[in-house]
């Protein structure tokens, strides 16, 4: 069993309190590694380091910062298989998905590097004679990045890239459930020569370490991917210092199948968008609405695909779905299904834990489909974040838009239709930040990953996401 330390100021150190935590393999329930369980004392130490390092890092020309980060991204690619195996063992995702996650982390960083020469300001006309107004973009300072357990490595890359290219320093706190691949970034940073204190990685509890990081006076920005309740706590904590906050939180994405949809294409997209990473993606198909005129035909196609899902060892290339990440999440799956059946839903497939044979250890749950679902049911409104899908009939476009908007979340929506009138109406009528038309979920780096309502604030990716890591400074220059 490997014992990990925290990466602070270019060194590997223990938590001040001497406490440690364990990382569990969700496929086998075996202890994988021991990590540091840091608290507020470690927050004070690492933020002091990051603040000091930022004064030098921001003076490095942006192009040079980007060149160093391209080496960092390439070294991530050089360690692709090792990092992917770590992700499988700590999170339970399929090996091929883990390989993709490593690639995405590297490409997030490479994409951010493309912005090194595009942090453009403005020259604005003044109302006064012989005066110019300059608006410059500058780094915010110290960024605290808190990442979720579902795609910990990709999320680290998503935040490290723009933060460092923009001239900030960063403190990354991965969740204690899946921190191992992220901690390996410290070794990679050492190898490529990222200056001490520019990239720091710490581990510990959300309330103790996370709370101290987000509320500290040295923290200029908090970027977090995780649950809505945690995001709400971060907003409160960061208000003490008026730090800039960027949050990507929960979701309850609807998948809409219109009467004119290509049903085979829609079924394939719906399947991938629900069971990808065991349903543990913020933009997953959480509630599926199918037009009544094509319901029977569509469900026949869709259910055949569901029945062919192979749950199994995530290292097995024949497996289609791995385990849930922990027992708490597994218990949540059981509770949601029980509540749905109590409220009148019909179990069409799955609905229980897998416990026999190879599933004797680990956190396994069947792909689950619920029919006879009404809009008012709990399963339609509470985020599952797992392999459970309620299916609801609808009759008109207006009805399904009302259903889709009937949620406290507003991250993503997927719709399958050939009618561009429907698509254009979504611009004005749908209350969410991302819309996928005739395809499953999965955003791109140059887009903008942005949630409405309780799904977040600030947004990530693309030019709008990169600008989150920059402040503006205005000069009124009189040259009389």
UniProtKB/Swiss-Prot annotation:
Explain the purpose of this protein.
Involved in the degradation of 3,6-anhydro-L-galactose, which is the major monomeric sugar of red macroalgae. Catalyzes the oxidation of 3,6-anhydro-L-galactose (AHG) to form 3,6-anhydrogalactonate (AHGA).
Protein EC: 1.2.1.92
Does the keyword field hold Hydrolase?
no
This protein's UniProt keywords: Carbohydrate metabolism, NAD, NADP, Oxidoreductase
Q: Which residues form the signal peptide?
A: none
Residues that, per the record, bind NADP(+): 149-150, 173-176, 226-227, 249, 383
Identification of the protein by name: 3,6-anhydro-alpha-L-galactose dehydrogenase
Name the residues annotated as catalytic in the UniProt entry.
Answer: 248 (proton acceptor), 282 (nucleophile)
> Cross-referenced CDD domains, in alphabetical order?
ALDH_LactADH-AldA
Use in biotechnology or industry: Could be used for bioconversion of red macroalgal biomass into biofuels or industrial chemicals.
Tell me which species this is from.
Vibrio sp. (strain EJY3)
What family is this? Belongs to the aldehyde dehydrogenase family.
GO molecular function (one): succinate-semialdehyde dehydrogenase (NAD+) activity
Asked if the keyword Oxidoreductase belongs to this entry, the reply reads yes
Which PANTHER family did the record assign? Answer: SUCCINATE-SEMIALDEHYDE DEHYDROGENASE, MITOCHONDRIAL (PTHR43353:SF5)
Q: Which InterPro entries match?
A: Ald_DH/histidinol_DH, Ald_DH_C, Ald_DH_CS_CYS, Ald_DH_CS_GLU, Ald_DH_N, Aldehyde_DH_dom, Aldehyde_DH_Superfamily
Write down a Pfam family by its short name.
Aldedh
The transmembrane segments are none
Q: State the gene name recorded for this protein.
A: Vejahgd
GO CC terms in record: cytosol
Q: Name one GO biological process term.
A: gamma-aminobutyric acid catabolic process
């Amino acid at each position: 069993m490997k014992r990990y330390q925290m990466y602070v100021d270019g060194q590997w150190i223990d938590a001040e309190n001497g406490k440690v935590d364990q990382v569990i393999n969700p496929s086998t329930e075996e202890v994988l590694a021991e990590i540091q369980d840091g608290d507020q004392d470690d927050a004070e130490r690492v933020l002091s380091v990051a603040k000091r390092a930022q004064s030098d890092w921001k003076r490095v020309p942006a192009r040079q910062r980007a060149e160093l980060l391209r080496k960092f991204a390439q070294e991530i690619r050089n360690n692709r298989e090792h990092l992917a195996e770590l992700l499988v063992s700590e999170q339970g995702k399929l090996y091929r998905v883990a390989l993709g996650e490593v690639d995405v982390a590297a490409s997030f960083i490479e994409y951010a590097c493309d912005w090194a020469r595009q942090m453009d300001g403005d020259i604005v006309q003044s109302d006064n004679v012989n005066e110019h107004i300059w608006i410059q973009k500058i780094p915010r300072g110290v960024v605290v990045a808190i990442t979720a357990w579902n795609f910990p490595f990709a999320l680290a890359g998503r935040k490290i890239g723009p933060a460092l290219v923009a001239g900030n320093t960063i403190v990354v706190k991965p969740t204690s459930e899946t921190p191992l691949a992220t901690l390996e970034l410290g070794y990679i940073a050492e190898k490529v020569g990222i200056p001490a204190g520019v990239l720091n990685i710490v581990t510990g509890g959300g309330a103790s370490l996370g709370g101290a990081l987000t509320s500290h006076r040295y923290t200029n920005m908090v970027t977090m991917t995780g649950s809505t309740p945690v995001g709400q706590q971060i907003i409160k904590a960061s208000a003490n210092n008026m730090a800039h906050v960027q949050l990507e939180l929960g979701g309850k994405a609807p998948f809409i199948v219109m009467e004119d949809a290509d049903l085979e294409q829609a079924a394939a997209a719906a399947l991938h968008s629900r069971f990808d990473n065991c349903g543990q993606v913020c933009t997953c198909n959480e509630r599926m609405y199918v037009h009544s005129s094509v319901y029977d035909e569509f469900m026949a196609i869709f259910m055949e695909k569901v029945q062919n899902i192979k749950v199994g060892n995530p290292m097995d290339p024949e497996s289609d779905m791995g385990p849930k990440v922990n027992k708490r999440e597994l218990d949540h799956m059981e509770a949601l299904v029980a509540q749905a059946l109590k409220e009148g839903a019909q179990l069409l497939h799955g609905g229980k834990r897998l416990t026999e044979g190879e599933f004797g250890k680990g956190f396994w749950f069947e792909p689950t489909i619920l029919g006879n679902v009404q809009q008012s049911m709990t399963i339609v409104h509470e985020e599952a974040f797992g392999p459970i899908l309620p299916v609801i009939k609808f009759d008109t476009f207006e009805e399904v838009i009302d259903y889709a908007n009937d949620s406290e979340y507003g991250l993503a929506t997927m719709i399958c239709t050939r009618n561009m009138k429907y698509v254009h109406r979504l611009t004005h009528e749908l209350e969410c930040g991302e819309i996928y038309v005739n395809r499953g979920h999965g955003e791109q780096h140059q887009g903008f990953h942005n949630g409405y309502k309780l799904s977040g604030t600030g947004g990530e990716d693309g030019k709008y996401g990169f600008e989150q890591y920059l402040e503006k400074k205005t000069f009124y220059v009189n040259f009389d």
